[in-house]
Amino acid sequence: MSHPSPQAKPSNPSNPRVFFDVDIGGERVGRIVLELFADIVPKTAENFRALCTGEKGIGPTTGKPLHFKGCPFHRIIKKFMIQGGDFSNQNGTGGESIYGEKFEDENFHYKHDKEGLLSMANAGSNTNGSQFFITTVPTPHLDGKHVVFGQVIKGMGVAKILENVEVKGEKPAKLCVIAECGELKEGDDWGIFPKDGSGDSHPDFPEDADVDLKDVDKILLISEDLKNIGNTFFKSQNWEMAIKKYTKVLRYVEGSRAAAEDADGAKLQPVALSCVLNIGACKLKMSDWQGAVDSCLEALEIDPSNTKALYRRAQGWQGLKEYDQALADLKKAQEIAPEDKAIQAELLKVKQKIKAQKDKEKAAYAKMFA
C-alpha cells in the first residue's frame, strides 16, 4: 500500500498529539507539539505516546521509569537533527521501548523529506527502543533505515533553537532537557500562547502564529505591540522579561524578512534596531557587560553610525575594564553627534579612568624597583 509522503500529508485529527516542554540551561524555551502517525505506524506511535505519558511504569530492562520527563537531548548536529530519548543512561547508550528492550521496524512508508519529522534512532535493523530524532532539514540518506512516525505541528522554532545550541562535538554545552511531556487530548490547550499576565496574545514563535509572514504590515503591528510590552517590563526593571519580549520581536522580524520581498522587509528594520538596542540597555542594567557589547555590535551591524549603540557599547567596555575600546567608541560617537552632552560626559569619565589606571601602574612599577 502506498502513502503520501509527510511533505504532502495533511495532519490527521484522529492521530495522537503529544508535547515536550523544553529547557535549555535551566531556562524554559518553549513547547514542541508532535503528531504521531498512528494511522500508518500504530505500534511505533503507541510506544512514543506512552513514553510521553509515563503510564507504563518501570522498564524491566533499565529499571527506570518508562518516561521522557527529565530526559536530555544528548546529540545535536546542526543542519541535520536533534536526538533524545535515552531516559536511562542519558548519553545515547540506553533506553528501552514499552514492548521490551527493542522492537522491530514497523514499516518505511514515509521518507525523511522535510524538517520537523520524528523518526526512530536505532543501532541497525529492528533495534528500536526509546531513542528518537527530529529532523531539521530533509535527510534522504536515512530513508529505509529509520522509521518515520510523526511530525512537529507546533514548536519548530523551539527545535531550531535546540539545533543551534553550542555543542562540544555533538553534545550540547548546556543541558537541553524535556522538562515536562504528555499527551494532548481533544480540546486541551496546546500551550503555545504565553501566560505571563503581560497581555501578550501572540505565540512565542512566528511559525506557530496564524499569520502570513509575508504580510509585513501585520508583522509590524505585532512587533510594535510586543515591543511596547517589553518597554513596560523595562520600566518596571524586570530586565529578563523585557529581553524575552524584545527577543520575541526579533524572531517575528526575522521570520517575516525570510518570507517577504527585500523592499517590504526593510520596513521592519527600525523596530528590530530599537529592540536590539533595548536588549543592550537591559544587559547593562544586569551588569552583563559582554552581553551588552555583543548586542550593541549587532545594532551597529544594522546601523554603523548609531550613537546609542556606540555609547552603550562603550559602557559595556568599561564594565569589562577595556577603557581604550570604550574611548574609541565614544570618540566615534562624538564625531557623529558633537553636541551630545551625555557622550561628552562619558568621554570625560573614560579619560579619567584611563589616567587613573596609568597612574596606578606607574605607582606599582615605582614600588617594584624602589
From Swiss-Prot:
Q: Does the keyword Cytoplasm apply?
A: yes
Summarize tissue expression: Detected in heart, thymis and brain.
Q: Name one GO molecular function term.
A: Hsp70 protein binding
Q: Where is this region: Interaction with HSP90AB1?
A: 214-370
EC number of the protein: 5.2.1.8
Residues recorded as bearing Phosphoserine in the entry = S5, S198
Q: How is its activity regulated?
A: Less sensitive to inhibition by cyclosporin A than is CYP-18.
Residue ranges of every copy of the PPIase cyclophilin-type domain listed in the record: 19-183
Give the signal peptide range.
Answer: none
**Subcellular location(s) per record:** Cytoplasm; Nucleus, Nucleolus; Nucleus, Nucleoplasm
Catalyses: [protein]-peptidylproline (omega=180) = [protein]-peptidylproline (omega=0)
Look up the record and report any one GO term of the cellular component aspect.
Answer: cilium
- PTM per UniProt? The N-terminus is blocked.
Which EC class heads this enzyme's classification?
isomerase
One GO biological process term is:
lipid droplet organization
| InterPro entries with a match to the protein in the record | Cyclophilin-like_dom_sf, Cyclophilin-type_PPIase_CS, Cyclophilin-type_PPIase_dom, TPR-like_helical_dom_sf, TPR_rpt
Under the heading SUPFAM superfamilies, the entry gives: Cyclophilin-like (SSF50891), TPR-like (SSF48452)
Task: State the superkingdom.
Answer: Eukaryota
Q: Which residues carry this modification: N6-acetyllysine?
A: K171
- Give the region (Chaperone activity) as residue ranges: 185-215
Q: Which UniProt keywords apply?
A: Acetylation, Apoptosis, Chaperone, Cytoplasm, Isomerase, Nucleus, Phosphoprotein, Protein transport, Repeat, Rotamase, TPR repeat, Transport
Q: Which CDD domains match?
A: cyclophilin_ABH_like (cd01926)
Task: Tell me how this protein assembles.
Answer: Identified in ESR1 or NR3C1/GCR steroid receptor-chaperone complexes. Found in HSP90 chaperone complexes with kinase clients LCK or EIF2AK1. Two monomers associate with one HSP90 homodimer. Interacts with HSP90AA1. Interacts with HSP90AB1; PPID and FKBP4 compete for binding to HSP90AB1 and the interaction is mutually exclusive with the PPID:HSPA8 interaction. Interacts with HSPA8; PPID and STIP1 but not FKBP4 compete for binding to HSPA8 and the interaction is mutually exclusive with the PPID:HSP90AB1 interaction.
Please explain the role this protein plays, according to its UniProt record: PPIase that catalyzes the cis-trans isomerization of proline imidic peptide bonds in oligopeptides and may therefore assist protein folding. Proposed to act as a co-chaperone in HSP90 complexes such as in unligated steroid receptors heterocomplexes. Different co-chaperones seem to compete for association with HSP90 thus establishing distinct HSP90-co-chaperone-receptor complexes with the potential to exert tissue-specific receptor activity control. May have a preference for estrogen receptor complexes and is not found in glucocorticoid receptor complexes.
Protein family per UniProt: Belongs to the cyclophilin-type PPIase family. PPIase D subfamily.
The protein in question is named Peptidyl-prolyl cis-trans isomerase D
The record lists the organism as Bos taurus (Bovine)
Name of the coding gene = PPID
